[in-house]
């Protein structure tokens, strides 16, 4: 076949594919206009930096997992709040029936506009998620949690019945169907997951996540959330220092770690991570216990310096602008 004939045959094939499957079903990479990854901030400056692209990528699946009470739901709710701030629509599939509206509101979530579902079975929850995502009107959907997506057969069965691999098959089937729709509609899908321990593991990490391997494969980003230490004010515990490790990242280099303060009743402390990142970039000077900015002392000890930034939003905004500029220069 001559070169011109090949070219004509290819053009005819491309037109046929577009006619059958719609515009954009196939394209040359050089023709694709939107090569930049569109993202939504995570609500944490440190996590945005660790993710490498400034937030969660649209049209991708994100898994957030970790031990109990480590801050997984808090991290997900901050993402919901950020989407809503930008005029987006958010849905929350509360399979655990543990949603706290007052706490979500404290984190900046507009609960009046939040679409909430508390499904009875795993199939119901995933079908609701599929319907919402397929509509193209949802910007972010959070499933809390994968472990609570119990298959219908298990709910309708008797206690003690064996249902080996049932949940894994359910997740595998659902993700095969959802992944394409999520990419097409540019929806951010966040799956919160718990941790289980494998029985009889003598060597290596005994920890695993429920729901089989499908979610690990389909996820663009996997975040491991763990408590590092308690934050105390005098003798009272007022929050936790949390480490968020990017264990998988298909859009930037993985294995980066973000350390954030999650304060009880308030969520991620923006001032705490801003102070740490500003000190790391030498925007804020740290000498001993004292923090200073432009030669002026802003606090003795980290908590006092955080308080200063919270009470002086103009200074905080100025520092944040410089920190973001520094992060862009690093990239």
Curated annotation (Swiss-Prot):
Annotated ATP binding sites: 66-73
Location comes to: Cytoplasm
Among Pfam families, the record links this protein to: RecA, RecA_C
The job of this chain, per UniProt, is described as: Can catalyze the hydrolysis of ATP in the presence of single-stranded DNA, the ATP-dependent uptake of single-stranded DNA by duplex DNA, and the ATP-dependent hybridization of homologous single-stranded DNAs. It interacts with LexA causing its activation and leading to its autocatalytic cleavage.
| One Gene Ontology biological process | SOS response
A single Gene Ontology MF term assigned here is: ATP-dependent DNA damage sensor activity
What residues form the membrane-spanning segments? Answer: none
- HAMAP family per the record? RecA
Keywords from UniProt, A to Z, are: ATP-binding, Cytoplasm, DNA damage, DNA recombination, DNA repair, DNA-binding, Nucleotide-binding, SOS response
The family line of this record is:
Belongs to the RecA family.
Q: What CDD domains does the database record attribute to this sequence?
A: RecA (cd00983)
Q: What is its main location?
A: cytoplasm
This protein's GO cellular component annotations are: cytosol
Protein name, please? Protein RecA
